[in-house]
Amino acid sequence: MARRQDEARAGVPLRVEGPPDKEVHLILYHWTHSFSSQKVRLVIAEKALKCEEHDVSLPLSEHNEPWFMRLNSAGEVPVLVHGENIICEATQIIDYLEQTFLDERTPRLMPDEGSMYYPRVQHYRELLDSLPMDAYTHGCILHPELTVDSMIPAYATTRIRSQIGNTESELKKLAEENPDLQEAYIAKQKRLKSKLLDHDNVKYLKKILDELEKVLDQVETELQRRNEETPEEGNQPWLCGESFTLADVSLAVTLHRLKFLGFARRNWGHGKRPNLETYYERVLKRKTFNKVLGHVNNILISAVLPTAFRVAKKRAPKVLGSTLVVGLLVGMGYFAFMLFRRRLGSMILALRPRPNYF
């Protein structure tokens, strides 16, 4: 595996080939605040699979670096590596995990196709996965006036908004510096430009937020059905039945992201959609969810400090030695904590020219 990663960095194309070997450990390239990455990480936790995780920092534009673009020409996280197989895009990764690890010790998150629950789970999974989460995310940054109680600090929102325009020029520069990846960089540049034209359109954002409410109405009705089907002494059900399924993965991570963006009160606050509110509160207490995603909405712990540590480690001279480097990291962590409300995030983001969040 190490050899294959060296090849990726050297420009040798990576191939997806051969049957999956369940004995080979999984490697996941992800970013903590990536919505798609969060779904994959929750699935891995629910299935109790051993996985080596590597952060690909979006604030530091590591997903645009040549080695990663050779791993996934779209330049997007997550990416799963399993032996000789490289799987990109969250839905494909989740399907791969569900279809590959079939032993009795590994929990199944999708009912058998002949089961009465299969159509229900498949419907809600597809419905929830069709939501334009990237548009909600970018939209709340570009139009924070549409959010309430957003967990993204105001200074970070301002900083990110001012840097979004730099992404195109960064990709153009990388395309010029890496001729073998020029086509991939140009394609990503075009996709990003097209997205931003929509995401900066406040009418479009209001439209998709209204459509989101219709989807959540369906979910609320389905949760009510589960409550009516369950005897008082029975186990509390999930979205499609007694078992936690891929539909629940999609719903749980969606609600957590909406809470982070500042769309919770609009969609399940003040007694609106009470079943949805109860469901989300229950999800927060689920052991696997709490382990994987319990801290991600705290931007200090999940983004600012890890980025600070990464920058400090990269910039610390090798002659300092490991002990002093660790001391610097601890000191920076304390410094970050004390100055978080005084715009530490802006300082960290400013350490690298032209960062982007896409």
Swiss-Prot record:
PTM annotation, UniProt: Ubiquitinated by PRKN during mitophagy, leading to its degradation and enhancement of mitophagy. Deubiquitinated by USP30.
TM spans (from-to): 292-312, 320-340
Induction context: Increased expression during neural differentiation.
Covalent cross-link (Glycyl lysine isopeptide (Lys-Gly) (interchain with G-Cter in ubiquitin)), residues: K50, K172, K173, K188, K190, K203, K206, K207, K214
Top-level taxonomic group: Eukaryota
Record localization: Mitochondrion outer membrane; Cytoplasm
Domain GST C-terminal stretches: 153-309
Transmembrane keyword on record: yes
A GO CC term assigned to this protein in UniProt: cytosol
Coiled coil is among the record's keywords: yes
Predominant cellular place of this UniProt entry's protein: mitochondrion
Name recorded for this polypeptide: Ganglioside-induced differentiation-associated protein 1
Family statement: Belongs to the GST superfamily.
InterPro entries: Glutathione-S-Trfase_C-like, Glutathione-S-Trfase_C_sf, Glutathione_S-Trfase, Glutathione_S-Trfase_N, GST_C_GDAP1, Thioredoxin-like_sf
Domain GST N-terminal: 24-105
Name of a matching Pfam family: GST_C_2
GO biological process, one term: mitochondrial fusion
